[in-house]
Design a protein with these regions (language model features):
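C-terminal motif of bacterial Sec signal peptides marking the signal peptidase cleavage site
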Residues: 15-18
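N-terminal non-catalytic regions of secreted/periplasmic and cell-surface proteins
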Residues: 24-71, 123-135
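Extracytoplasmic/surface-exposed domains of secreted proteins
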Residues: 53-72, 88-125
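N-terminal module-boundary/linker segments of secreted carbohydrate-active enzymes
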Residues: 131-200, 205, 209-212, 433, ...
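Substrate-binding cleft of secreted/luminal carbohydrate-active enzymes
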Residues: 166-171, 411-483
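Aromatic-lined carbohydrate-recognition surfaces of secreted/lumenal glycan-active proteins
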Residues: 169-171, 301-304, 337-369, 411-422
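Aromatic- and acid-rich polysaccharide-binding/catalytic face
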Residues: 197, 370-394, 448
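Substrate-binding cleft of extracellular glycoside hydrolase catalytic domains
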Residues: 204-349
């Protein structure tokens, strides 16, 4: 019996040892080798892309990868790629592209390797693509409606300077003066070439407002000193049909969320909106005709930034127009623009150069559509503007290029500029000489005001920004204006 127990014990021990051996063999099985496979690329083979919108080629793989620093070229020139900022399984290759050019990107063996095993290389990669040819810019030789000698001469002056110099301008802090232009002169020794006046308070009852728009002396004095006049209009409307407009300018707004005023109804006879729309245009027209009689022409930028955020690809509560004139969509906006254009023409206004303001892609073509469906048409404006705040010189170039390509027969101008909101140092407007050298050759720029700026000009750029701009050979100042 004892022998039997010993024998069974030995058999059990043998079985256990055998199982242990089997387990050891299992642990010694080699790990499958790492392989790298390209899963996707942001530019397809043979694609035709827009140079301004294509700055990166992203290659996505099946595993985590890293770049080694060599072996990636664009048309034979080495480029420095880097890991994608959102995933370790992709690589971004920077692209500096020109219009109308064929390109070849090559990724050599060992240029991209496995993070886990750097001896494992991504497969060699070659991509052929091209950029779209730049549309030929054919600026119209004459304005769409302006026919006074002063207006035709001013338009010709802008056209001749376009691409040669950028015309400087400053906003008159929504007042009827040129006090900020005086501050720029005190700081730099030069006046901006153009001063912008806003009809924002013209709805205040006659005789009760702090601005007497019928007194055009602040405008004629500027023009007689050699300056160019720009006019714009924050078109305020009553908050409701029964709202009384206060002597202090209260009771009105531009925001569609603060008024019952309907942009569509402004085009329908018999509505209170229609009556108000035309009554306010009559007020502005009276002032413009006084300037016309005095031999003064002006640029005219009404209904600016119409699209607001309405072109966002993914709609949300905030993706809408921020001014009432855009609240009912692009078709109504275009009808409003044309109604104003035709009414001004009917009333004999012939001294204005019309500027339409685009939102372009709101600076992000992946999130916004371009607002070309808001464009009133080539017969209804002379220039296309873009308002930019906190944009670098490189970003200015991208915006300028996109707009010029979209509207090649119009002069492209920087309608407003300055720092981004309250961020005076973190997101300033790019220096104008830098914008110019990058290729953003705006027809003119207009710096917005800020009474709390804490600088010598009360504008949304620094004193050094103004000094840099007004001393640049590419920036036109008032003493250089001749037309």
């Amino acid at each position: 019996m004892r022998k039997t127990i010993i024998l069974l014990t030995l058999i059990s021990l043998f079985v256990l040892l055998s199982c242990g051996g089997s387990s050891d063999e299992s642990n010694d099985t080699p790990t499958p080798p790492v392989t790298i496979t390209l899963r996707s690329q942001s530019i397809s083979e043979g694609a035709e892309v827009e140079s301004a919108n294509t700055t990166i080629l992203t290659l996505s793989y099946n595993t985590t990868v890293k770049v080694t620093g060599t072996g990636i070229t664009l048309n034979g020139t080495s480029v420095t790629a880097k890991s994608n900022s959102t995933t370790s399984m992709a690589v971004d290759i920077p692209l500096a592209l020109e219009d109308g050019t064929d390109y070849v990107v090559k990724v050599a063996k060992n240029a991209i390797v496995s993070t886990a095993d750097p001896t494992v290389s991504a497969p060699e990669f070659t991509l052929n693509f091209k950029t779209k040819a730049k549309p030929v810019s054919t600026i119209a030789s004459s304005p769409v409606i302006a026919s006074t000698n002063a207006a035709k001469n001013l338009y010709t002056f802008f056209r001749n300077q376009y691409g040669q110099k950028v015309i400087s301008s400053v906003m008159a802090d929504v007042a009827w003066n040129y006090s900020l232009a005086e501050k720029v002169h005190t700081l730099t020794g030069k006046y901006p070439a153009m001063n912008c006046y806003d009809f924002i308070h013209i709805q205040v009852p006659d005789g009760n407002g702090w601005i007497d728009y019928s007194n055009t002396k602040p405008v004629t004095d500027w023009a007689n000193a050699g300056g160019i006049v720009q006019l714009m209009w924050h078109f305020n409307v009553p908050k409701s049909e029964t709202t009384t407009i206060g002597m202090d300018g209260s009771g009105v707004t531009c925001s569609p969320s603060e008024t019952t005023f309907s942009a569509s109804n402004a085009l329908k006879e018999g509505t209170w909106e229609h009556e108000y729309f035309y009554a306010q245009m009559d007020r502005v027209i009276a002032v413009v005709l006084n300037l016309q009689e005095a031999g003064i022409a002006a640029t005219w930028r009404p209904f600016h930034e119409a699209a607001g955020n309405a072109t966002a690809k993914q709609q949300a509560s905030w993706t809408k127009a921020w001014f009432w004139w855009g609240a009912d969509g692009p078709d109504t906006f275009k009808s409003l623009w044309i109604a104003m254009f035709d009414y001004f023409k009917q009333k004999g206004v012939k001294n204005l150069i019309w500027i339409w303001t685009t939102q372009n892609y709101n600076g992000n073509s992946s999130s916004y559509n371009q607002d070309s469906d808001w464009y009133p048409g080539t017969s209804y404006c002379d220039m296309v503007a873009r308002d930019l705040y906190g944009y670098t010189a490189v970003q200015n170039l991208q915006e300028f290029t996109e707009i010029q390509d979209a509207y090649p027969n119009k002069m492209v101008v920087l309608g407003e500029c300055g720092w981004d909101g309250s961020d005076k140092t973190g997101k300033p407007q790019g220096l104008m000489p830098d914008c110019w050298s990058q290729g953003a050759k705006w027809g003119h720029f207009m710096v917005w005001y800020d009474g709390n700026a804490g600088n010598n000009t009360s504008t949304m750029v620094s004193d050094d920004w103004w000094k840099d701009a007004m001393s640049s050979p590419n920036v036109m100042t008032r003493d250089q204006v001749i037309y």
